[in-house]
Protein backbone atom coordinates (compact mmCIF):
# COMPACT_ATOMS: atom_id res chain seq x y z
CA UNK A 1 0.00 0.00 0.00
CA UNK A 2 3.00 2.35 0.35
CA UNK A 3 4.58 1.69 -3.03
CA UNK A 4 5.68 4.80 -4.94
CA UNK A 5 3.20 5.47 -7.74
CA UNK A 6 4.24 8.91 -8.99
CA UNK A 7 6.82 11.66 -8.69
CA UNK A 8 6.00 15.21 -9.68
CA UNK A 9 8.94 17.60 -9.47
CA UNK A 10 8.76 21.28 -10.30
CA UNK A 11 10.83 24.44 -10.34
CA UNK A 12 9.90 26.93 -7.59
CA UNK A 13 11.67 29.97 -6.11
CA UNK A 14 13.65 30.12 -2.89
CA UNK A 15 13.93 33.00 -0.43
CA UNK A 16 16.50 34.80 -2.60
CA UNK A 17 14.34 34.58 -5.71
CA UNK A 18 16.45 31.84 -7.25
CA UNK A 19 14.98 28.63 -8.70
CA UNK A 20 15.04 25.47 -6.63
CA UNK A 21 13.55 21.99 -6.83
CA UNK A 22 10.30 20.92 -5.17
CA UNK A 23 9.19 17.29 -5.31
CA UNK A 24 5.87 15.56 -4.60
CA UNK A 25 5.97 11.79 -4.08
CA UNK A 26 2.68 9.88 -4.24
CA UNK A 27 2.05 6.43 -2.76
CA UNK A 28 -0.38 3.67 -3.61
CA UNK A 29 -2.58 4.42 -0.57
CA UNK A 30 -2.97 8.07 -1.62
CA UNK A 31 -0.36 9.47 0.77
CA UNK A 32 1.79 12.32 -0.51
CA UNK A 33 5.03 13.86 0.69
CA UNK A 34 6.37 17.22 -0.49
CA UNK A 35 9.88 18.59 -0.06
CA UNK A 36 11.60 21.74 -1.30
CA UNK A 37 15.39 21.86 -1.56
CA UNK A 38 17.46 24.72 -0.07
CA UNK A 39 20.66 26.22 -1.50
CA UNK A 40 23.69 27.97 -0.04
CA UNK A 41 25.54 31.24 -0.69
CA UNK A 42 28.86 30.28 0.90
CA UNK A 43 29.34 26.72 -0.29
CA UNK A 44 32.12 24.29 0.53
CA UNK A 45 34.27 22.96 -2.31
CA UNK A 46 33.54 19.42 -1.17
CA UNK A 47 29.73 19.67 -1.22
CA UNK A 48 27.48 17.56 -3.41
CA UNK A 49 26.66 19.35 -6.66
CA UNK A 50 23.52 21.41 -7.04
CA UNK A 51 22.65 20.96 -10.72
CA UNK A 52 21.92 24.24 -12.55
CA UNK A 53 20.91 24.62 -16.19
CA UNK A 54 23.20 27.42 -17.37
CA UNK A 55 22.14 29.55 -20.34
CA UNK A 56 20.05 32.73 -20.22
CA UNK A 57 17.00 31.43 -18.41
CA UNK A 58 17.00 32.60 -14.75
CA UNK A 59 20.49 33.96 -15.49
CA UNK A 60 21.79 30.42 -15.72
CA UNK A 61 20.36 29.32 -12.37
CA UNK A 62 17.39 27.31 -13.62
CA UNK A 63 16.93 23.78 -12.27
CA UNK A 64 14.87 22.22 -15.06
CA UNK A 65 17.53 19.56 -15.66
CA UNK A 66 17.23 18.41 -12.05
CA UNK A 67 13.43 18.55 -12.26
CA UNK A 68 13.47 16.43 -15.41
CA UNK A 69 15.83 13.93 -13.77
CA UNK A 70 13.44 13.48 -10.84
CA UNK A 71 10.37 13.16 -13.06
CA UNK A 72 11.86 10.65 -15.47
CA UNK A 73 15.08 8.78 -14.72
CA UNK A 74 14.70 8.71 -10.95
CA UNK A 75 11.02 7.77 -11.08
CA UNK A 76 11.77 4.98 -13.55
CA UNK A 77 14.32 3.60 -11.07
CA UNK A 78 12.31 3.77 -7.83
CA UNK A 79 8.68 3.64 -8.98
CA UNK A 80 6.88 0.70 -7.36
CA UNK A 81 9.30 0.43 -4.44
CA UNK A 82 7.87 0.65 -0.91
CA UNK A 83 8.48 4.16 0.44
CA UNK A 84 9.41 2.69 3.82
CA UNK A 85 12.60 1.31 2.24
CA UNK A 86 14.40 4.66 2.59
CA UNK A 87 17.94 3.31 2.56
CA UNK A 88 17.29 1.17 -0.51
CA UNK A 89 15.69 4.08 -2.37
CA UNK A 90 18.51 6.50 -1.53
CA UNK A 91 21.16 3.96 -2.53
CA UNK A 92 19.42 3.32 -5.86
CA UNK A 93 19.47 7.06 -6.63
CA UNK A 94 23.11 7.41 -5.61
CA UNK A 95 24.13 4.45 -7.79
CA UNK A 96 21.98 5.73 -10.65
CA UNK A 97 23.81 9.06 -10.52
CA UNK A 98 27.14 7.25 -10.63
CA UNK A 99 29.36 10.20 -9.64
CA UNK A 100 31.09 10.86 -6.30
CA UNK A 101 29.33 14.22 -5.86
CA UNK A 102 25.90 13.62 -7.46
CA UNK A 103 26.79 15.90 -10.35
CA UNK A 104 24.97 13.95 -13.08
CA UNK A 105 21.41 13.93 -11.73
CA UNK A 106 22.04 16.71 -9.21
CA UNK A 107 22.00 16.57 -5.43
CA UNK A 108 18.98 18.88 -5.60
CA UNK A 109 17.02 16.25 -7.55
CA UNK A 110 18.11 13.32 -5.38
CA UNK A 111 17.54 15.15 -2.09
CA UNK A 112 14.12 16.43 -3.11
CA UNK A 113 12.98 12.90 -3.87
CA UNK A 114 14.67 11.46 -0.77
CA UNK A 115 12.95 13.84 1.65
CA UNK A 116 9.60 13.64 -0.13
CA UNK A 117 9.72 9.83 0.10
CA UNK A 118 10.26 10.02 3.87
CA UNK A 119 7.42 12.51 4.28
CA UNK A 120 5.06 10.38 2.21
CA UNK A 121 5.95 7.29 4.25
CA UNK A 122 5.42 9.23 7.48
CA UNK A 123 1.98 10.32 6.31
CA UNK A 124 1.11 6.75 5.35
CA UNK A 125 2.14 5.54 8.80
CA UNK A 126 0.09 8.22 10.53
CA UNK A 127 3.16 9.60 12.29
CA UNK A 128 4.72 13.07 12.33
CA UNK A 129 8.01 13.13 10.42
CA UNK A 130 10.19 13.52 13.52
CA UNK A 131 8.62 10.40 15.07
CA UNK A 132 8.74 8.38 11.83
CA UNK A 133 12.45 9.12 11.33
CA UNK A 134 13.58 9.24 14.96
CA UNK A 135 11.43 6.64 16.67
CA UNK A 136 10.17 6.72 20.25
CA UNK A 137 13.30 8.42 21.62
CA UNK A 138 12.85 11.59 19.52
CA UNK A 139 11.88 14.11 22.18
CA UNK A 140 14.78 16.58 22.49
CA UNK A 141 13.96 20.12 21.33
CA UNK A 142 17.07 21.90 20.02
CA UNK A 143 18.59 25.14 21.25
CA UNK A 144 18.20 27.61 18.36
CA UNK A 145 21.34 29.38 17.16
CA UNK A 146 19.75 32.65 16.05
CA UNK A 147 21.73 34.64 13.51
CA UNK A 148 20.90 38.24 14.41
CA UNK A 149 23.85 40.07 12.81
CA UNK A 150 24.90 39.05 9.28
CA UNK A 151 28.19 39.72 7.56
CA UNK A 152 30.43 38.06 5.00
CA UNK A 153 28.69 36.47 2.02
CA UNK A 154 25.28 36.95 3.65
CA UNK A 155 25.34 40.75 3.70
CA UNK A 156 26.68 43.79 1.89
CA UNK A 157 28.73 45.27 4.73
CA UNK A 158 32.38 45.32 5.90
CA UNK A 159 32.02 42.60 8.59
CA UNK A 160 34.31 39.68 7.75
CA UNK A 161 32.57 37.01 9.82
CA UNK A 162 29.34 35.69 8.36
CA UNK A 163 27.09 35.16 11.38
CA UNK A 164 26.79 36.41 14.94
CA UNK A 165 24.30 34.27 16.85
CA UNK A 166 22.48 34.18 20.16
CA UNK A 167 21.71 30.89 21.91
CA UNK A 168 18.93 31.08 24.55
CA UNK A 169 20.33 28.30 26.75
CA UNK A 170 18.50 29.57 29.84
CA UNK A 171 15.03 28.88 28.45
CA UNK A 172 12.94 25.97 29.72
CA UNK A 173 11.10 25.31 26.45
CA UNK A 174 11.56 25.98 22.74
CA UNK A 175 8.60 28.36 22.86
CA UNK A 176 10.33 30.36 25.60
CA UNK A 177 13.62 30.26 23.66
CA UNK A 178 11.91 31.75 20.61
CA UNK A 179 10.36 34.47 22.75
CA UNK A 180 13.71 35.35 24.33
CA UNK A 181 15.37 35.48 20.93
CA UNK A 182 12.63 37.69 19.54
CA UNK A 183 12.98 40.14 22.42
CA UNK A 184 16.74 40.43 21.93
CA UNK A 185 16.30 40.75 18.15
CA UNK A 186 13.90 43.69 18.50
CA UNK A 187 16.06 45.30 21.18
CA UNK A 188 19.06 45.05 18.86
CA UNK A 189 17.06 46.75 16.12
CA UNK A 190 16.47 49.73 18.42
CA UNK A 191 20.11 49.84 19.52
CA UNK A 192 21.40 49.82 15.95
CA UNK A 193 18.91 52.47 14.83
CA UNK A 194 19.81 54.68 17.79
CA UNK A 195 23.46 54.62 16.66
CA UNK A 196 22.53 55.53 13.09
CA UNK A 197 22.97 52.07 11.58
CA UNK A 198 20.56 50.72 9.00
CA UNK A 199 18.32 47.90 10.13
CA UNK A 200 17.74 46.18 6.81
CA UNK A 201 18.05 42.42 7.06
CA UNK A 202 20.30 39.97 5.21
CA UNK A 203 19.55 36.64 3.56
CA UNK A 204 18.90 34.90 6.86
CA UNK A 205 16.83 37.61 8.50
CA UNK A 206 19.55 39.15 10.65
CA UNK A 207 20.62 42.77 10.57
CA UNK A 208 23.45 43.80 8.27
CA UNK A 209 24.81 47.04 9.79
CA UNK A 210 27.95 48.74 8.54
CA UNK A 211 30.12 47.56 11.44
CA UNK A 212 33.79 46.92 10.80
CA UNK A 213 34.85 44.28 13.32
CA UNK A 214 33.70 41.20 15.16
CA UNK A 215 34.14 42.84 18.59
CA UNK A 216 31.94 45.77 17.50
CA UNK A 217 29.17 43.37 16.47
CA UNK A 218 29.54 41.32 19.65
CA UNK A 219 29.40 44.44 21.83
CA UNK A 220 26.10 45.49 20.23
CA UNK A 221 24.66 42.04 20.89
CA UNK A 222 25.88 41.94 24.50
CA UNK A 223 24.27 45.31 25.19
CA UNK A 224 21.02 44.19 23.55
CA UNK A 225 20.88 41.00 25.63
CA UNK A 226 21.24 43.04 28.81
CA UNK A 227 18.72 45.69 27.73
CA UNK A 228 16.21 42.93 26.94
CA UNK A 229 16.51 41.83 30.57
CA UNK A 230 18.77 38.81 30.19
CA UNK A 231 22.22 37.90 31.48
CA UNK A 232 24.90 37.13 28.87
CA UNK A 233 26.57 33.81 29.55
CA UNK A 234 23.70 32.62 31.71
CA UNK A 235 20.37 33.20 29.97
CA UNK A 236 21.89 33.81 26.57
CA UNK A 237 25.20 32.66 25.07
CA UNK A 238 26.85 33.62 21.78
CA UNK A 239 27.96 31.79 18.67
CA UNK A 240 30.01 32.69 15.58
CA UNK A 241 30.05 31.40 12.04
CA UNK A 242 33.27 32.83 10.65
CA UNK A 243 32.96 31.15 7.22
CA UNK A 244 36.73 31.56 7.11
CA UNK A 245 37.16 29.89 3.74
CA UNK A 246 35.57 32.99 2.20
CA UNK A 247 38.51 35.21 3.27
CA UNK A 248 41.34 32.65 3.22
CA UNK A 249 43.65 33.85 0.46
CA UNK A 250 47.11 32.54 -0.42
CA UNK A 251 47.38 30.71 2.88
CA UNK A 252 46.40 33.69 5.04
CA UNK A 253 43.22 35.06 6.59
CA UNK A 254 42.48 38.48 5.10
CA UNK A 255 40.18 40.41 7.45
CA UNK A 256 39.47 43.38 5.19
CA UNK A 257 36.90 44.95 7.51
CA UNK A 258 39.37 44.90 10.40
CA UNK A 259 42.26 45.94 8.16
CA UNK A 260 44.62 43.10 8.93
CA UNK A 261 45.91 39.79 7.61
CA UNK A 262 46.60 36.85 9.93
CA UNK A 263 48.65 33.70 9.61
CA UNK A 264 46.86 30.48 10.47
CA UNK A 265 48.16 30.30 14.05
CA UNK A 266 47.34 33.95 14.70
CA UNK A 267 43.79 33.43 13.41
CA UNK A 268 43.30 30.53 15.82
CA UNK A 269 44.63 32.66 18.68
CA UNK A 270 42.31 35.54 17.74
CA UNK A 271 39.28 33.26 17.90
CA UNK A 272 40.40 31.79 21.22
CA UNK A 273 40.75 35.33 22.59
CA UNK A 274 37.22 36.23 21.46
CA UNK A 275 35.86 33.05 23.08
CA UNK A 276 37.61 33.97 26.33
CA UNK A 277 36.40 37.60 26.33
CA UNK A 278 32.76 36.97 25.36
CA UNK A 279 30.33 34.15 26.33
CA UNK A 280 30.95 32.44 22.98
CA UNK A 281 30.19 28.73 23.29
CA UNK A 282 30.24 27.81 19.59
CA UNK A 283 32.51 28.76 16.67
CA UNK A 284 31.68 27.45 13.20
CA UNK A 285 34.23 27.31 10.38
CA UNK A 286 36.77 29.21 12.42
CA UNK A 287 39.43 28.02 10.00
CA UNK A 288 39.30 27.41 6.23
CA UNK A 289 37.95 24.13 4.83
CA UNK A 290 41.34 22.68 3.92
CA UNK A 291 43.48 24.32 6.62
CA UNK A 292 43.68 21.12 8.67
CA UNK A 293 46.74 22.34 10.59
CA UNK A 294 44.92 25.53 11.53
CA UNK A 295 41.91 23.53 12.67
CA UNK A 296 44.17 21.36 14.86
CA UNK A 297 45.70 24.46 16.41
CA UNK A 298 42.28 25.96 17.12
CA UNK A 299 41.01 22.67 18.57
CA UNK A 300 44.04 22.37 20.85
CA UNK A 301 43.62 25.99 21.99
CA UNK A 302 39.93 26.04 22.85
CA UNK A 303 38.28 22.74 21.92
CA UNK A 304 37.79 21.60 25.51
CA UNK A 305 35.51 24.52 26.35
CA UNK A 306 34.19 25.74 22.99
CA UNK A 307 32.09 23.88 20.44
CA UNK A 308 34.06 23.97 17.17
CA UNK A 309 31.70 23.24 14.30
CA UNK A 310 32.86 22.01 10.92
CA UNK A 311 30.61 23.14 8.07
CA UNK A 312 32.76 23.66 4.96
CA UNK A 313 35.28 21.40 6.70
CA UNK A 314 32.99 18.34 6.87
CA UNK A 315 30.15 19.20 4.42
CA UNK A 316 27.84 16.67 6.13
CA UNK A 317 30.11 13.96 4.71
CA UNK A 318 30.81 10.97 6.95
CA UNK A 319 34.15 10.24 5.26
CA UNK A 320 35.50 13.76 5.85
CA UNK A 321 34.09 13.68 9.38
CA UNK A 322 35.94 10.43 10.10
CA UNK A 323 39.15 12.09 8.88
CA UNK A 324 38.55 14.94 11.32
CA UNK A 325 37.81 12.58 14.19
CA UNK A 326 41.00 10.62 13.50
CA UNK A 327 43.06 13.85 13.44
CA UNK A 328 41.42 15.30 16.55
CA UNK A 329 40.06 18.26 14.61
CA UNK A 330 36.93 20.20 15.63
CA UNK A 331 34.33 18.59 17.90
CA UNK A 332 31.05 19.17 16.07
CA UNK A 333 29.52 18.87 12.61
CA UNK A 334 27.03 21.17 10.93
CA UNK A 335 24.36 19.11 9.21
CA UNK A 336 22.95 20.48 5.96
CA UNK A 337 20.86 17.99 4.04
CA UNK A 338 21.75 19.45 0.65
CA UNK A 339 25.50 19.29 1.27
CA UNK A 340 25.40 15.51 1.02
CA UNK A 341 22.15 15.09 -0.92
CA UNK A 342 20.10 12.32 0.71
CA UNK A 343 18.33 11.62 3.99
CA UNK A 344 20.19 8.34 4.53
CA UNK A 345 23.62 9.99 4.24
CA UNK A 346 22.49 12.86 6.47
CA UNK A 347 21.44 10.47 9.23
CA UNK A 348 24.70 8.56 8.80
CA UNK A 349 26.71 11.74 9.34
CA UNK A 350 24.82 12.51 12.56
CA UNK A 351 25.30 8.95 13.82
CA UNK A 352 29.02 9.05 13.00
CA UNK A 353 29.35 12.29 14.97
CA UNK A 354 27.44 11.06 18.00
CA UNK A 355 29.43 7.80 18.17
CA UNK A 356 32.64 9.85 18.38
CA UNK A 357 31.16 12.19 21.03
CA UNK A 358 31.02 15.01 18.49
CA UNK A 359 27.92 17.19 18.58
CA UNK A 360 25.71 17.78 15.55
CA UNK A 361 23.91 21.00 14.60
CA UNK A 362 21.00 20.76 12.15
CA UNK A 363 21.10 23.68 9.72
CA UNK A 364 19.24 25.61 7.04
CA UNK A 365 20.89 27.31 4.05
CA UNK A 366 20.85 30.99 3.12
CA UNK A 367 18.50 30.17 0.24
CA UNK A 368 15.47 28.63 1.96
CA UNK A 369 11.77 27.99 1.38
CA UNK A 370 8.71 27.56 3.57
CA UNK A 371 9.65 23.87 3.93
CA UNK A 372 10.23 23.06 7.62
CA UNK A 373 11.67 19.54 7.29
CA UNK A 374 14.89 20.37 9.16
CA UNK A 375 12.89 21.20 12.30
CA UNK A 376 11.59 17.63 12.33
CA UNK A 377 15.04 16.23 11.55
CA UNK A 378 16.60 18.18 14.43
CA UNK A 379 14.19 16.49 16.83
CA UNK A 380 14.40 13.11 15.07
CA UNK A 381 18.18 12.99 15.49
CA UNK A 382 18.29 14.45 19.02
CA UNK A 383 20.84 16.98 17.75
CA UNK A 384 20.09 19.41 20.54
CA UNK A 385 20.92 22.41 18.34
CA UNK A 386 19.50 24.01 15.19
CA UNK A 387 20.60 26.88 12.97
CA UNK A 388 17.72 28.35 11.06
CA UNK A 389 18.31 32.07 10.92
CA UNK A 390 16.99 35.12 12.67
CA UNK A 391 13.62 36.21 14.01
CA UNK A 392 12.34 37.65 10.75
CA UNK A 393 11.52 36.33 7.26
CA UNK A 394 8.87 33.64 7.03
CA UNK A 395 11.32 31.19 5.45
CA UNK A 396 13.23 31.22 8.76
CA UNK A 397 10.24 31.44 11.10
CA UNK A 398 8.61 28.41 9.45
CA UNK A 399 11.19 26.23 11.22
CA UNK A 400 10.77 27.89 14.63
CA UNK A 401 6.99 27.63 14.35
CA UNK A 402 7.26 23.93 13.49
CA UNK A 403 9.45 23.33 16.54
CA UNK A 404 6.81 25.00 18.71
CA UNK A 405 4.19 22.67 17.22
CA UNK A 406 6.39 19.63 17.78
CA UNK A 407 6.95 20.61 21.41
CA UNK A 408 3.21 20.99 21.88
CA UNK A 409 2.60 17.59 20.29
CA UNK A 410 5.17 15.88 22.51
CA UNK A 411 3.53 17.26 25.64
CA UNK A 412 5.26 16.13 28.86
CA UNK A 413 7.75 14.06 26.83
CA UNK A 414 9.31 17.22 25.39
CA UNK A 415 12.74 18.16 26.68
CA UNK A 416 14.56 21.38 25.79
CA UNK A 417 18.32 20.91 25.40
CA UNK A 418 19.18 24.21 27.13
CA UNK A 419 22.47 24.39 29.01
CA UNK A 420 23.29 20.75 28.29
CA UNK A 421 24.90 21.86 25.01
CA UNK A 422 27.61 23.90 26.79
CA UNK A 423 31.04 22.23 26.86
CA UNK A 424 33.40 22.19 29.82
UniProtKB/Swiss-Prot annotation:
The active site is at 204 (proton donor), 336 (proton acceptor). Keywords: Cytoplasm, Glycolysis, Lyase, Magnesium, Metal-binding, Secreted. It is found in: Cytoplasm; Secreted; Cell surface. The lineage of its organism: Bacteria, Pseudomonadati, Pseudomonadota, Alphaproteobacteria, Hyphomicrobiales. GO terms for molecular function: magnesium ion binding; phosphopyruvate hydratase activity. Pathway: Carbohydrate degradation; glycolysis; pyruvate from D-glyceraldehyde 3-phosphate: step 4/5. GO terms for biological process: glycolytic process. The keyword Secreted applies. SMART domains: Enolase_C, Enolase_N. Its cofactor is Mg(2+). Coiled coil: none annotated. Its EC number is 4.2.1.11. This is Enolase. The gene is eno.
Amino acid sequence: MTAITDIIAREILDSRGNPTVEVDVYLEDGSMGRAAVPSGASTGAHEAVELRDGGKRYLGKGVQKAVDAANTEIFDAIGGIDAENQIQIDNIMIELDGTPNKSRLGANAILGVSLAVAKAAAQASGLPLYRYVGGASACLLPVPMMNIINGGAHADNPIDFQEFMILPVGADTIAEAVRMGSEVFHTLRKELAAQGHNTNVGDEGGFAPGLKSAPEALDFIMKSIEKAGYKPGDDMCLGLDCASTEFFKDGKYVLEGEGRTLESGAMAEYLAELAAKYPIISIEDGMAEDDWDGWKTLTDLTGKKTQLVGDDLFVTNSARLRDGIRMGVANSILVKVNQIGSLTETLDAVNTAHKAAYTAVMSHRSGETEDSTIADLAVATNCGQIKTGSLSRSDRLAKYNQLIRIEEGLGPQAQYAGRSIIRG
